[in-house]
Amino acid sequence: MTTAHTHKGAYSLGASFCAAVAIILLLVLNPGTTPVYATDVFGDLRQPGDASFVAGHRGDRSGAPENTLPALQRAIESPLEFVETDIARSSDGVPVLFHDRTLKRTTNGVGPLAARTLAELKTLDAGSWYSSEFTGERIPTLEEFLAIFAPSEKKALLELKGYWTPEDLAIVTELIEKAGVADRVIFMSFNLGSLSSAAALAPGIPRVAILRTLPEDVIGFARSFGVIGVVTESRLLRDRPELVDDMHTAGLGVMVYTLNSVETWAEARALGVDGIITDRPSHLDQWLAETAPGT
């Protein structure tokens, strides 16, 4: 996830209309599909003052390079309920875990990730930028992540980077089904088209929209696009503090990203959000334990 304001056309009226139509057609053509609700994924929706669930942003990047197997393993082995990661794809269509559009920040490569084959990506060093301890760490594939995730009892927030057609996304849903974890993953995206593709291919896997701006009618938006909730910035909820309660009344979940300080954690808890995505998951988990009522 990023707070950069890119993909300005992602929420254009035309794209939104097409995605909404796709969701409606999905419901018409698949009447037997079992609905998925926020409570199925997040448990009881929170009240103001309740502890949110904690999701490690790109794994536990406080102790290992983001979106690498060591960072993800740290999150899986921690007390956290959720791990969050990003899914991109190589030029030959293999799903890999990577956040940025380009390789420079977190590898010794340059240029767009999408321009490289998996074999080329696997030659890159994705660890030494973080620490010499992780020199030689490779960009993992989704399949490699699912292999360490499947034996756990965790849940995964899988952010689809950019636009995925149904054809592009088919390998992702196949890998999830093969790993037997379809009941423990949630698709997220800024891109409504990708969420529409996910709904068409795997309607039983819940979906969450990531929003940089909040529409006036957030509940209507969620209903239109068949999502169980939204992920947004806490500053947007600060301006509309009643919104969290309204969404919970409507059966929708609310998560915030990416909060890394005690002040922002306290504000999110006071609002009653269901989940906090953070770069400091162990610290947040400890803070929640230390500040729980009665401690």
Q: Where in this protein do the model-derived segments appear?
A:
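Phosphate-group recognition and catalysis centered on beta-loop-alpha active-site segments
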Residues: T2-T295
